[in-house]
Amino acid sequence: TNSKEGEFIAEGGGVRGPRIVERXQSAC
């Protein structure tokens, strides 16, 4: 999860990173 969180944060996810990751996995 650290890799995905790092990527989202790098893109500018910040605090929303982990939440977006969870939604993305559920959507997929």
From Swiss-Prot:
Phosphoserine modification, residue list: 3
GO terms, biological process: adaptive immune response; blood coagulation; innate immune response
Keyword annotations: Adaptive immunity, Blood coagulation, Coiled coil, Disulfide bond, Hemostasis, Immunity, Innate immunity, Phosphoprotein, Secreted
Top-level taxonomic group: Eukaryota
PTM comment, free text: Conversion of fibrinogen to fibrin is triggered by thrombin, which cleaves fibrinopeptides A and B from alpha and beta chains, and thus exposes the N-terminal polymerization sites responsible for the formation of the soft clot. The soft clot is converted into the hard clot by factor XIIIA which catalyzes the epsilon-(gamma-glutamyl)lysine cross-linking between gamma chains (stronger) and between alpha chains (weaker) of different monomers.
Localization per record: Secreted
Primary site of residence: secreted
Cellular-component GO terms for this entry: extracellular region
Reported function: Cleaved by the protease thrombin to yield monomers which, together with fibrinogen beta (FGB) and fibrinogen gamma (FGG), polymerize to form an insoluble fibrin matrix. Fibrin has a major function in hemostasis as one of the primary components of blood clots. In addition, functions during the early stages of wound repair to stabilize the lesion and guide cell migration during re-epithelialization. Was originally thought to be essential for platelet aggregation, based on in vitro studies using anticoagulated blood.
Record's subunit section: Heterohexamer; disulfide linked. Contains 2 sets of 3 non-identical chains (alpha, beta and gamma). The 2 heterotrimers are in head to head conformation with the N-termini in a small central domain.
Free-text note on domains in this protein's UniProt record: A long coiled coil structure formed by 3 polypeptide chains connects the central nodule to the C-terminal domains (distal nodules). The long C-terminal ends of the alpha chains fold back, contributing a fourth strand to the coiled coil structure.
Protein's name according to its UniProt entry: Fibrinogen alpha chain
This protein's encoding gene: FGA
